[in-house]
Every structure is written in structure tokens, then in C-alpha cells.
A protein has these predicted regions:
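N-terminal secretory signal peptides and thylakoid transit peptides that target proteins
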Residues: 1-17
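Beta1/beta-strand and adjacent pyrophosphate-binding region of the FAD-binding site
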Residues: 56-68
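Core beta-strand elements of the Rossmann-like FAD/NAD(P) dinucleotide-binding domain
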Residues: 58-60, 248-257
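Conserved redox-cofactor binding core of oxidoreductases
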Residues: 140-248, 269-270, 317, 439-459
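A glycine-rich dinucleotide-binding beta-alpha-beta segment and adjacent secondary-structure elements
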Residues: 228, 427-507, 599-603
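Glycine-rich loop(s) and the adjacent beta-strand/alpha-helix scaffold that form part
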Residues: 253-321, 517, 523-526, 530
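An anion/pyrophosphate-binding glycine-rich loop and adjacent beta-alpha core
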Residues: 294-296, 303-423
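Active-site- and interface-proximal helix/loop "cap" or "latch" segments in soluble metabolic
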Residues: 566-659
């Protein structure tokens, strides 16, 4: 068993505040020993692991955080590999399940062709860097997903449904199967479900059954949010999780591994604003994804990736109606054009200008721009504006819920409309005038809307409604390896820590529908298997006193600008002047009243800008004997400040020589 010195232990412990942990977890025997008589025999030195210093309330081989698809797959796989597992879930049972429970239950499938999947997912990265091993791992899973779900999770292949070309009630589901038909490898990509249905929780229920079928190996703790990871401060090994249960904190020992499967941060407004630059929005999926796992991973040194990547909705520029907190938002004109997003209907932002093609079929919130599909930049406020005729068409088609129709406010003129929604009337007037021109001429020079989806405003009445951006899910989180290991900022695996699912998803740019579920299953399997593997014993520590002689204030100081001394001969003089950053110091040698040498003793000028002046000018001062002659020397182009400072320093030295 490896031993680590007390010096190394304390160094790491102090870095993570573990001294407080040790003190809080010390047994009563420690205080008893401390109060013993000084004449007592010295206590025997003991060796212990960091885990020995923590008071544990429960112990498992593997702790899984989160009970969505990723967590359930990780737990099931770990159990099948011989581990005793606990899933800790922040929600009560009826609210658990994350996005998995409420999503479309669609899974990306490459019809057995891994190479096609690799080509496709590489293209979806849009030129962004992503490790080939990650592409290989997701492609392996997506290519074989039909067999994986049948062979490992008990789904019936005879019930599978391919959604390619399927249109349901005006919703063109086939538009996502594949979602990017222009990309290489698309011919093999499709969306499948495990039975003839969607958005019904069927896949979630089947995965959950795999957990309940393993009650001898898997415990589930509902209403038990993970609060922090417990980490050895020296080796950085994650040895357990602190969980809040029944109002108390409990430390759960994880002998072999911890899997973070806590989803994204779409329900954390602060994180959404910080990472996605989206202010006013409404989430669509599970309402409890608040970035908990991301913050816990950061606290133990995890690197983050893809934090600016997210998926939105499927129509009307990915905006939606505002909803109360905790209520999933509606999807509008999903994968379709209808009375809401065609005709005399536009979206304007805070300044009254259009910012998006309202009729475009949106790909998970992504809109086409210069050869790539990206999330639009949403203004602070968004307003939906229609005319009298359009309102009638919406009502006739039943394209908008009655409660939302009731929120439309009528205005008799554009000026009244502008005042009512708080935008500049001149700009809004120009916006509507331009849109009418685009509609009449069949060409949208602002946002590229197709002619058949535009109609000029009738000028009778204007109706407006406040809207917000719709957010389906986020992709960012702790960076992971192809082995589902969570990586630190140096690219090294944090020992015993794994992740799967949307908490650090693999999507870096464009997103194929069904990939999040596919990666929950793919990386859940990898994480569960690797977390279950028996690990080497933790190192032990020997605590003993050491002597030290620390440097005192002032002993070590690299501060620029401190007074320095320089050696000079009888005919040498030190000149100084302020450069771009620090002072420039020269030693000038004077013979018979003229400069014979200039040495630059100190400079902190910028490489490639100021430094050339310090290298080229000194020889130009040789032979000069007056301030005027020195200042007349041509400076170095692009280094005026450095050149002038150097001249000033040389003049300063020459004046000393002349007395």
C-alpha cells in the first residue's frame, strides 16, 4: 500500500480546506488523547487513508447521482458488473426522471453503420474541436442502439418504430430523421422509438424497470439531493458524496466510483444568463435541472466544456409564451408552418427591429446562418406582432391556445403599438413598412423568409404579445473522456469520478435529435462499467511533525520598480527614463566628451514592438555629444514611446558626464 508523507497530505488538505473536514470528523478519542498527561507515553503513530478520517453514514461500491436515463443506465450496468449501487435523486419519485421522462422518447440510430455515424457527428461539430475518441464512442453507441436496447435492456425489436418520413397531426417528425440531411453519413441516420409512440414516457419506464428489477443490487434514495463530492486532497480521488436526506447531511462512501448524471442547467437562470447569454426564457423539459452536478464537479477540479451549447424549440424562431416558474413552456409551430408563424406575423426585439426568420423550420432551436445552424442571439425582450386578418386565421385554425389568444393586445396604429410595447415608433414603423415591401415583392432582405410565408399587414389593427425564448436543454458540464471519466483542467482523469448524459454532453455545435438519449445510454453504460471496477486501495498517510524555516516578508520579492544599483567606471554614467511598462536603464560610456558606448541594462518592453528599439538605437548614439543631437536620432517605427524613453535615458547620463 502506498504511503504519503504528512507534508504532502497537509499541503493538499490545506488547498481544499480539508483541515476543517478532518476536525469535523475526528473521533472523541482525539480530544481524550489531547487532554492526557504530558508524562504519558507517546502515542503510537498510526497510518490511515483519507477515507478513514470521514464519518460515513452509508457505503456502496458505486454512487450514482441522478435518476434520468444516464443515471439508471449507469446504475444498471454497474450492478450487472457486480457492484452494490445507490442512486441519489434530488426529487421525490413522482417528479424524478429529468428530461428523460418528459422528452419525445426518440433515440438516434445509425442502422448499424458506425462509419456513417462518425462522418455525420464529425460534420455536426461544425469545425469545432472534439476528440476523435468521443466521436468514436458516440458513433459506436448510435450504430448499435437497436441491439443495445433489446439485448441489454429488454426492449422488443418487433415494436420499434422508425420515424423517417412520418408526419403526425401537422408535425413533421420526419424532419428530424435525419435532422441534417445535407451532412455526410445522413443516409444511415434516423430517429427511432422503442414502440409505436412518442412523448409518452415509454423508454423511461423501460429503463426504470431495469433498476427495479435489480433491487438486490440497487438502492434508490428519492428526495436526497447530492450536495458535494468528498475528495482525497492529495490524490484527488473522489471517495464519496455528501447527500441531504430527511433534513440531515449524510456521507456516502463510494468504494469504486461516483457517476454524475444530474443533467444540465436549463432551470438555473443565473447560469443560463452567464453561459448562454439568454435572459428571458422558459424551459421546456424537466424543471429540476439546475446545474448541481456541474458545480460539484468544478469544486473537485473538473474542467468544463460545451457550456455555450444548448437546444431550443422547433418553430417561430424558438420563442414561446411566458409561463410560471416550474411549468414547462409550450412549443409553437413545431417543425411546421401554420397560422402562427406565416402571413402577417413578425417578431421584433427591444428596439422594434426583426431579428429572425419567423417561418423557418427550426432545428432544435438552431437557425441557418452562413453554412451552419446556430442558436439565434435573442434580444432582451421579444414581441410577437400580427394583424387583424392573421388573428382571424389563427382562431379559425385553432393554432393558438385560448389562454394565449386572450393575451394579445389590440392597437389601432403603429404609433400606439410602439408606445404600448415600449419600442421606438420610427424604427417599428420602418420595420413593418420594410416587411410589407418584402412580402409584396417576394424577397425578405432582412431575415430571408420565403415568399409563400409572407403577407403584408392589412393596416386595420395590430396585435402584440410578449414572448420569451424557449430552452429545451443545455449540453455543457464537466469534460469527460471516451471512458466517461471526468477530466481536470490539465486533461487528467479525476480518480473514481465519471459522468454521463447532459451533464457535460458531447454536442459542441449542431445537434441531431435523439442524440442526448443515445449518449445517456452510451456513456451511462461506459460510466457504470468503469465505476464498478474494483480500484486499488487508497494510499495511507503518516502524520508527524516536521521542522520548517519559512521565508519572511521581504525575503523574496520580484516586484518591478524597486531601486537597483549598477556598477560604473569613472567614465560611465547611469541614465534612466520611463518606458512602456517599467523604467529603461542605460549605462553610457563617455570619452573626450563624446558617447563611446550605450548599454541597455534594464528594460521590460514588448517583444517585437519596443524591444527592437533597445537593440538598434544604442549604436546610433555613439559619437554624439549634445542633447539636441541625441533627440535628432530617428526612432524605430512602431516603437515611438520606447525610442523616446531611450533617448531621454541617454541624455540623462550625458548631462551627468558634463557636470
Amino acid at each position: 500500500m502506498e504511503k504519503i508523507s504528512r507534508k504532502s497530505f497537509v499541503k493538499g488538505a490545506l488547498g481544499l480546506g480539508a483541515v476543517g473536514i478532518l476536525a469535523g470528523c475526528a473521533s472523541s478519542a482525539s480530544s481524550t488523547a489531547a487532554s492526557a498527561s504530558s508524562t504519558a507515553a507517546p502515542a503510537e503513530k498510526k497510518e490511515f487513508t483519507f477515507a478513514d478520517t470521514v464519518r460515513w453514514d452509508a457505503q456502496y461500491d458505486v454512487v450514482v447521482m441522478g435518476m434520468g436515463a444516464a443515471g439508471m443506465v449507469a446504475a444498471k450496468t454497474a450492478a450487472d458488473n457486480g457492484a452494490k449501487v445507490v442512486i441519489v435523486e434530488k426529487c421525490e419519485e413522482g417528479k424524478a426522471g429529468g428530461n428523460t421522462k418528459v422528452c419525445g422518447q426518440l433515440v438516434a440510430y445509425a442502422n448499424g453503420d458506425k462509419d456513417a455515424a462518425k462522418s455525420y457527428y464529425t460534420a455536426l461539430a461544425g469545425g469545432r474541436d472534439i476528440e476523435p475518441e468521443i466521436i468514436d464512442a458516440i458513433s459506436e453507441g448510435v450504430a448499435n442502439m437497436a441491439d443495445i436496447l433489446a439485448d441489454e435492456f429488454g426492449f422488443n425489436k418487433d415494436e420499434y418504430m422508425d420515424w423517417t418520413g412520418v408526419n403526425v397531426g401537422g408535425t413533421n417528425m420526419g424532419a428530424m430523421s435525419p435532422e441534417y440531411p445535407e451532412m455526410p453519413g445522413h443516409e444511415k441516420m434516423a430517429l427511432w422509438t422503442t414502440h409505436a409512440g412518442a412523448s409518452d414516457g415509454y423508454l423511461y419506464q423501460g429503463l426504470k424497470q431495469n433498476v427495479t428489477d435489480r433491487v438486490d443490487a440497487i438502492d434508490v434514495w428519492y428526495s436526497s439531493p447530492a450536495k458535494s463530492l468528498i475528495q482525497d486532497p492529495v490524490t484527488k480521488t473522489v471517495v464519496g458524496v455528501t447527500v441531504e436526506r430527511d433534513g440531515k447531511e449524510m456521507n456516502i462512501r463510494a468504494l469504486n466510483g461516483v457517476c454524475i448524471c444530474t443533467g444540465g442547467f436549463e432551470c438555473n437562470k443565473e447560469m443560463v444568463q452567464h453561459y448562454l447569454n439568454v435572459i428571458n426564457y422558459a424551459p421546456r423539459g424537466g424543471q429540476f435541472n439546475t446545474g448541481d452536478g456541474i458545480k460539484m464537479a468544478q469544486a473537485v477540479g473538473a474542467d468544463l466544456w460545451h457550456m455555450d451549447c444548448y437546444e431550443g424549440l422547433f418553430g417561430l424562431g424558438s420563442v414561446t409564451y411566458p409561463v410560471e416558474e416550474g411549468i414547462p413552456c409550450d412549443m409553437i409551430a413545431t417543425l411546421a408552418q401554420n397560422a402562427v408563424n406565416t402571413g402577417a406575423a413578425i417578431l421584433v426585439g427591444t428596439d422594434g427591429d426583426r431579428f429572425v426568420n419567423e417561418s423557418e423550420t427550426v432545428r432544435h432551436g438552431h437557425l441557418y446562418e452562413n453554412g451552419i445552424w446556430e442558436n439565434p442571439t435573442f434580444p432582451e425582450k421579444v414581441w410577437y406582432i400580427i394583424d387583424e386578418t392573421q388573428k382571424g386565421e389563427i382562431e379559425a385554425a385553432g393554432a393558438m391556445p385560448e389562454e394565449q389568444l386572450a393575451k394579445l393586445t389590440a392597437y389601432d396604429s403603429i404609433d400606439a403599438l410602439a408606445e404600448g410595447i415600449g419600442v421606438d415608433k420610427d424604427r417599428l414603423t420602418k420595420t413593418i413598412k420594410n416587411y410589407n415591401s418584402f412580402a409584396n415583392n417576394g424577397e425578405d432582405y432582412k431575415c430571408g423568409r420565403e415568399a409563400q410565408y409572407m403577407r403584408a399587414f392589412d393596416g386595420k389593427k395590430y396585435y402584440a404579445m410578449y414572448m420569451v425564448s424557449g430552452l429545451l436543454n443545455t449540453q455543457g458540464g464537466p469534460k469527460r473522456s471516451a471512458n466517461a471519466e471526468v477530466l481536470d483542467t490539465q486533461g487528467n482523469p479525476i480518480p473514481h469520478l465519471y459522468s454521463a448524459g447532459e451533464c457535460g454532453g458531447i454536442t459542441v455545435c449542431m445537434y441531431q435529435g435523439g442524440t442526448n438519449i443515445a449518449e445517456c445510454i452510451t456513456f451511462g453504460r461506459i460510466a457504470g462499467k468503469n465505476a464498478a471496477a474494483v480500484k486499488d486501495a487508497l494510499p495511507t498517510y503518516t502524520v508527524e511533525a516536521v521542522e520548517s524555516a519559512p521565508a519572511q516578508p521581504g525575503d523574496i520579492d520580484d516586484l518591478v520598480g524597486k531601486e537597483e544599483t549598477y556598477e560604473t567606471a569613472d567614465n560611465q554614467y547611469i541614465g534612466k527614463a520611463q518606458g512602456m511598462d517599467d523604467e529603461i536603464v542605460v549605462r553610457v560610456t563617455v570619452d573626450d566628451g563624446k558617447i563611446s558606448q550605450v548599454e541597455v541594462l534594464k528594460q521590460n518592453e514588448t517583444e517585437g514592438i519596443g524591444v527592437p528599439a533597445t537593440e538598434q538605437l544604442p549604436e546610433k548614439f555613439v559619437g554624439l555629444d549634445t542633447e539636441e543631437a541625441i533627440n535628432a536620432v530617428d526612432g524605430i517605427s512602431g516603437a515611438t514611446i520606447t525610442s523616446n524613453a531611450l533617448k531621454q535615458a541617454v541624455v540623462n547620463a550625458l548631462l551627468q558626464a558634463k557636470g
